Structure formats: C-alpha cells, structure tokens
C-alpha cells in the first residue's frame, strides 16, 4: 500500500493524471522522488504511440510537443517561466527569489516560453520516428527526472519553503540518492548502447549548468529551478537526438 501511495504522490504532484485522494505523510513522501521518473516513462509511452500513428508530419510534431505538457499539466514549464523572469531581472539574490514567488507571468517569461515552444516544435519536425528512437526517448525522459530527483536530494536548497524543500525534507535522502544514482547510471549506459551518447552528454551538461546557476544566482535550488532544469534538459536532449539522426548515428 505504501508503495502505491508513494507512486500516487509523485503522479499527483508532478502530473495531471488523476490519482486517488489520500493524506500525504512522512511515510508515503519519503521515497516519492524515486517514483518521479515513472512519469517520464508514461510520457515516453504516449510519445511512442503518437510516433506510430499515421499522422501528417506537422500533426505528429505537434503531438510530440504537446504530450509532455498535457501529461504534466505544465508544472515544469511554470518553473521554467518563473526562472527565466528571475534570471532576466539581473537583480540580487533576494530579488530573484522574490520573482520566483510572484504568481504573475512577466514579459521575459512569455518571450522565453514562445521561443521554447517554437524550438521544441521545430526539433520535433526533424525527428524521424523509429522503434529505436522511441526507446531512446523514453529512456531520456526517465533520465531527466532521475537527475532532477537526484539534484533535489543532493543540492543545497535556496530557501526553507516551497515544493523542492518540502520533498527534500520529507525524503530519505541517502536512499533516494542511491536509488536515483544507480537508475541514472543504468539509463546512461542503456542510452549510450543505443547510440544516444550525445543525449547523455547533453543531460549531464545541463545538470552541471543547473548546479552552477542555482548556486551563483539563487544560493541553491527551488521547485521552479527544478522545472527550469527539466525543460532545458529535455530541449537539449531533443536537439541531440535530431543531431544524431542527421549524422546517421541512429
């Protein structure tokens, strides 16, 4: 029962998929970050279904771009937008953290979101779907969430409130780090074996950038920054996927 509740907590928080309602507590939140990557598997499965449907190229690309938003409910895009606003303010650390808490969407957030979707859609039009590509992208979506959860359990927090702090405080950090580190390592090996080493490098590069920016600009990570990382990792891995196909590696 605890295992199912733990999975339900992850899906309730990080997806728009309906799950049974129950009280969240220390037990069912302890390993919720370990279940977070499962959402990537669901998105990847839906992505593969879209890939095999007999749709026109542009319609298929639109499906590829919209599936992650539909399944997650846009929670990570919200963090991406808020973080873009904060970084574009060029204010001090306290000012940036205040902007992250502001529920309004600023001009820079709108510009970055439009640019993000345009780039994502353009890359999706370049994807030539094959079973190998489908499996590789499923692994990529799981990997980015494993790295995100690993960061929440490992990186310093910027503040003592918020989503990331709540899950980090409730988590058995040692166990979560071990599980997600092993999972991430296995995924990296699997992706490289499929010819997706460029996707692995892209994800790890964005993770390094995430750590550097969060420490320098915010003094640690927040839930918004976690969403910013996930969206950037996804975009750059998608670009790497297209590059691999264009280069004849897939």
Walk through the language-model features, giving the residues of each.
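Acidic (Asp/Glu-rich) catalytic motifs at the cytosolic membrane interface
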Residues: 67-105, 214-233
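C-terminal ends of transmembrane helices
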Residues: 18-24, 75, 95, 149-159, ...
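Membrane-proximal soluble regions of multi-pass membrane proteins
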Residues: 1-24
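N-terminal beta-alpha supersecondary unit
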Residues: 9-12, 26-51, 165-169
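Membrane-embedded alpha-helical segments that form the functional core of polytopic membrane enzymes
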Residues: 34-83, 135-139, 196-216
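Solvent-exposed interhelical
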Residues: 146-180, 217-222
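Alpha-helical membrane-inserting segments
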Residues: 46-54, 67, 71, 124-127, ...
């Amino acid at each position: 029962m605890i295992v199912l509740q733990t999975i339900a907590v992850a899906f309730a928080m990080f997806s728009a998929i309906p799950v049974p309602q129950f009280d969240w507590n220390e037990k069912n939140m302890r390993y919720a970050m370990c279940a977070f990557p499962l959402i990537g598997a669901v998105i990847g499965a839906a992505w593969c279904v879209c890939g095999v449907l007999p749709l026109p190229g542009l319609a298929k690309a639109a499906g590829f771009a919209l599936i992650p938003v539909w399944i997650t409910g846009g929670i990570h895009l919200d963090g991406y937008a808020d973080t873009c606003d904060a970084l574009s303010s060029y204010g001090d650390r306290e000012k940036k953290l205040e902007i992250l808490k502001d529920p309004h969407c600023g001009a820079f957030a709108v510009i970055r979101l439009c640019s993000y979707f345009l780039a994502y859609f353009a890359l999706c039009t370049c994807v030539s779907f094959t079973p190998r590509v489908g499996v590789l992208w499923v692994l990529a979506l799981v990997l980015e969430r494993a790295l995100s959860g690993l960061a929440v359990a490992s990186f310093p927090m910027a503040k003592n409130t918020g989503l990331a702090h709540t899950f980090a405080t409730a988590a058995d950090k040692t166990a979560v780090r071990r599980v997600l580190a092993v999972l991430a390592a296995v995924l990296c090996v699997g992706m490289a074996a499929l010819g997706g080493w460029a996707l692995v490098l892209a994800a790890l590069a964005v993770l390094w950038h995430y750590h550097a920016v969060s420490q320098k600009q915010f003094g640690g990570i927040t839930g918004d920054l976690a969403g910013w990382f996930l969206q950037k990792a996804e975009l750059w891995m998608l670009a790497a996927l297209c590059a691999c196909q264009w280069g004849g590696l897939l």
